């Protein structure tokens, strides 16, 4: 049986590994001891009890393949190199190293216990503060404003964004729907407002953003300035380039620099999709089908190239019952409101789904 090595145990890497588990000898390599369902970490800021269900062991993910804990320092079309110098050979290598984000929305290192401890500490700090400022008008900042204002309606929440509307890169209609709901929850929106100096860009802090913002007291500040692709592992490959977002440039079949039998997907890869779970639902089925055909002897050039979603889809809950979303269907997408957003994501944040995919029922032990 052909050997497939997947580097990175996030959403893309685990989904692809599961999809190929029955047709290849799959080895998934990940530095962390548990899968971090970081989509739910935003609500974890107001409800840290979620931690019992969003830090999920890898042991039950694959039936035939293997999940190995280790740090990958080198990749090629023939295999990978681990930090201890061990080399693992493979017939196909897929890199899905994902992206980084400020704490407490993603781990800052490989220790999942440290991530859990920090999220609990941030929650305790949040409960003690009356004034909250969120810097960043993208999905994380918008969702966080919705979660805090829903769970703590008595707190003063201000969302600061340098853009003229929320959710840059998406439709004005979506931005308007989310802005109206946030204002209805009492959130103050400060658009077209740049914050040039932050005490930290990587974790929450207590400090002023400037008197011009009119903060009533010194706020707890959450930086939510966007994801940063993790691409260092590609830099040793000759000819590999990065796009303006820092994502690895790929050919039509998701190969960096056209390297034979080396593929990339997810947040680190310039696929033409945004860095969202919605994007993964298109990339993984395509790559799984493509690699299955290759493993059966089909030449890659005879297979259809990857095509990103024609419309940027995204699900943006504002707490368990509110929010708005764009579904990547039809030519221009379909925008849906509170009920559909709650049903698709807001109520459960995919927690039961990922527990089930990893072999658990209600909690990960």
Label the model's feature ranges:
Residues 1-66, 143-172:
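Beta1-alpha1 glycine-rich phosphate/pyrophosphate-binding loop at the start
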Residues 2-3, 63-133, 211, 222:
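FAD-binding core/adjacent interface of flavoenzyme oxidoreductases
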Residues 9, 97-98, 225-226:
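Glycine-rich, N-terminal phosphate-binding loop of Rossmann-like dinucleotide-binding domains
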Residues 65-76, 80-81, 88, 154-252, ...:
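A Rossmann-like FAD-binding core segment of flavoenzymes
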Residues 111-130, 216-289:
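FAD-site-proximal beta/loop scaffold in flavoenzymes
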Residues 125-155:
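Rossmann-like NAD(P)H-binding beta-loop-alpha module
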Residues 265-319:
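A conserved FAD-binding loop/helix module that cradles the flavin
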Residues 314, 319-365:
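C-terminal auxiliary extensions adjacent to catalytic cores
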């Amino acid at each position: 049986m052909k050997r497939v090595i997947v580097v990175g145990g996030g959403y893309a890497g685990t989904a692809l590994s599961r999809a190929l588990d029955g047709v290849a000898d799959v080895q998934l390599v990940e530095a962390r001891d548990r899968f971090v369902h970081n989509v739910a970490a935003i609500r974890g800021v107001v409800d840290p009890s979620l931690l019992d269900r969003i830090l999920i062991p890898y042991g039950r993910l694959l039936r035939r393949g293997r999940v190995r804990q280790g740090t990958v320092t080198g990749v090629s079309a023939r295999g990978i190199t681990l930090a201890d110098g061990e080399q693992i050979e493979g017939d196909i290598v897929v890199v899905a190293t994902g992206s980084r984000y400020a704490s407490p929305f993603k781990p800052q290192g490989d220790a999942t216990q440290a991530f859990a401890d920090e999220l609990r500490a941030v929650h305790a700090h949040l409960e003690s503060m009356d004034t909250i400022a969120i810097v960043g008008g993208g999905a994380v900042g918008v969702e966080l404003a919705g979660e805090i204002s829903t769970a703590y309606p008595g707190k003063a929440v201000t969302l600061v964004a340098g853009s003229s509307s929320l959710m840059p890169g998406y439709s004005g209609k979506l931005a308007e729907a989310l802005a109206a709901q946030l204002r209805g929850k009492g959130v103050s929106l400060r658009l077209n407002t740049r914050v040039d100096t932050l005490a930290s860009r990587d974790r929450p802090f207590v400090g002023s953003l400037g008197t011009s913002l009119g903060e009533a007291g010194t706020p707890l500040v959450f930086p939510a300035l966007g994801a940063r692709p993790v691409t260092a592992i590609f830099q040793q490959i000759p000819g590999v380039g990065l796009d303006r977002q820092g994502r690895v440039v790929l050919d039509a079949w998701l190969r960096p620099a056209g390297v034979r039998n080396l593929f990339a997907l997810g947040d680190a890869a310039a696929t033409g999709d945004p860095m969202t779970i919605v994007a993964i639902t298109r990339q993984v089925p395509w790559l799984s089908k493509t690699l299955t055909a290759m493993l059966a002897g089909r030449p890659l050039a005879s297979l259809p190239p990857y095509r990103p979603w024609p419309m940027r889809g995204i699900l943006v809950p504002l707490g368990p019952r509110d929010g708005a979303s764009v579904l990547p269907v039809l030519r221009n997408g379909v925008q849906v409101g509170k009920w559909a957003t709650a049903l698709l994501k807001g109520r459960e944040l995919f927690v039961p789904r990922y527990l089930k995919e990893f072999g658990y029922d209600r909690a990960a032990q």
